[in-house]
Amino acid sequence: MALRNLRYDGDEILRKKSKEITVIDDRILTLLDDMIDTMYENDGIGLAAPQVGILKRAVVIDVEDGNIYKMINPRILSTSDEEQTAQEGCLSVRETKGMVSRPIKVTAEYTDVEGNLITIEAEGLLARAICHEIDHLNGVLFTDKIIKSTK
């Protein structure tokens, strides 16, 4: 496993839509492991492949102290009508934090590293992280959704 270089706001790759992963091979597994190392090294709770310069639909998330989600081709199936506004930051936008409104609950679907299709019901911080990271896969940064800047 190795650290990958982060891409920062202003890098055009962060504004491009990522491609579906069709084969889960050693390159994808290594990418996910490297993303986890890079996320931890930078004190993050989530990281999407475009943030390390790879336009593939891959995300890693750890909001629960070591309960790591490795998500391939994640997508949101449904969201709660109720939203919560909370502060967000981003490893690719280091100097900015802001209040962003997100659904309190989401139902998401993704493929795990063994090729199994997983459906997850998430709420709170995990739901927020899933939405934030999937936004990255679609070329959207949290700064596009800020209601009020806090830093």
Show the residue positions of the predicted features:
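Positively charged
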Residues: 1-151
